[in-house]
């Protein structure tokens, strides 16, 4: 069983046609809505100014000034490249906007819906800036539609997908591996219409140090193509402390007329806790709704996403129990990658991007010897 913390959760990379994020500097004036990068505990994070900050007030680091700065999350301090469209909608610009228009805010990497017709004097702040205006009317100009297309693979959700029409799609991003952030594995969730995935990892000199391909993601079931996996796992435990570039190439399955789709990419530290015992139980939480008309008995359906719940027992050694339990508790309050596959299996349904609802360690004895941890893991919503 493998447990992995995802360093890419909330990744806000600087993509093509998107302005770079400057480093925060004390004592320098910052205009309203400007974004700055600041490293917290070894991890670079992005911040956006709620207001115009004069030089004399810009003395406290963004992470310690929540009234001045909006935390945008981990940004990776890298350039993100992809051939997927940044957004399905046109870029926001000043000028008159018709009600019902959806536009892409490149500063926030999100799409926004215009709630009302805006005149040129009204449409001077970007949608993300309007959301934090002190004027209630201005806050109501736009409605947040969520993360834009190219960035959905890094938004920490598997049901929002990055899409590209064509025979393939790629993404490329950097990762600085050191004591504060390590890559032991790469997981891809929420794949659709994909027949193979290739992972290449390049060092700072441009030499490939990893080159792995997972294929045969589809098989025939009585003549019909069937998807074998919605997720994949790559092992990158051989990487040493250095700066790397990760590139993932997704190839569309033969005959597919729709787009290549990826839900989420996870890169991070992985911990192998021990083998999963036989008797694992899997069930799904179905959030769809069915309603029957009381007069005629007709049934209407509202299709929604599902979430998996995995109940499993993992074997370990009693001397390791303190370390394991402390590690699990250290990452509470957020989603992790849970992979209950053993070394000889690679089942998609035994992987979850979610959280531990409950875990316990029933000691069979206090002496050195075998022990076990019982997990109940609930995944986030899939197939939304």
Describe each PLM feature range.
Residues 1-17, 145-211, 215-384:
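Extracellular/virion structural assembly segments
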Residues 1-155:
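Tryptophan-rich substrate-binding surfaces of secreted polymer-degrading and adhesive proteins
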